[in-house]
Amino acid sequence: MRKLDTRTIVVASHNKGKIAEIADLIGPFGFSAKSAAELNFSEPEETGTTFEENAAIKALASAKASGLPALSDDSGLVIDALDGAPGVYTANWAETADGTRDFAMAMQKVEDALAERGASKPEDRTARFVSVLCLAWPDGHVEYFRGEVEGTVVWPPRGTSGFGYDPIFKPDGYDTTFGEMSADEKHGWKHGDAFALSHRARAFKKFVETCLEA
């Protein structure tokens, strides 16, 4: 595993919600970070079929364009009753005809697909959020960090916090959805803690332990 010997990195994302969450997580570590969106980097086409492949595409593009290490996230909602969908195509389910993303529409698509499968009981609506962070260097070296959190898809959507599919995902052991939690509650982790809640915080915890700590 390669250690990160700089605190200047690029957050390889154009997703405002994702950029904000990563900024919250890296903030305490003294990073100087700009996003690919702020640097006006074009969005690379995500042609991978796994979270790891798509995360690497984004991180490597930003690392090579900037000459700096770049941290990306590829994440998605994996629903058992839908054979793992939307999975790596989670963002695609939200795409509209004009190229924007409508997650209210995407959540309705999820519910409609579950209804078609007759998945109305909680035990038939099990799912997990997956996050794969990729740290890439300009020389092409990459490190991956995967985090997952198990839960249930609920309906109707609950809460207005977070972003994406957060309002319909209730993590196991909790009565509230990610959409009803503050950012601190959703991540459930700060440096030194043994436990993290969200998929992204779990992946980030591995990143810290692997690349930042001595």
Curated annotation (Swiss-Prot):
Protein name, entry field: dITP/XTP pyrophosphatase
Lineage summary: Bacteria, Pseudomonadati, Pseudomonadota, Alphaproteobacteria, Hyphomicrobiales
Binding positions for Mg(2+) per the UniProt entry: 45, 74
Family annotation (InterPro entries): dITP/XTP_pyrophosphatase, ITPase-like_fam, RdgB/HAM1
A GO biological process held by the record: nucleotide metabolic process
GO cellular component: cytosol
Assembly and oligomerization: Homodimer.
EC number: 3.6.1.66
Role: Pyrophosphatase that catalyzes the hydrolysis of nucleoside triphosphates to their monophosphate derivatives, with a high preference for the non-canonical purine nucleotides XTP (xanthosine triphosphate), dITP (deoxyinosine triphosphate) and ITP. Seems to function as a house-cleaning enzyme that removes non-canonical purine nucleotides from the nucleotide pool, thus preventing their incorporation into DNA/RNA and avoiding chromosomal lesions.
Active site: 74
Keyword Hydrolase annotated: yes
Keywords in alphabetical order: Hydrolase, Magnesium, Metal-binding, Nucleotide metabolism, Nucleotide-binding
Binding locations of substrate: 13-18, 75, 163-166, 186, 199-200
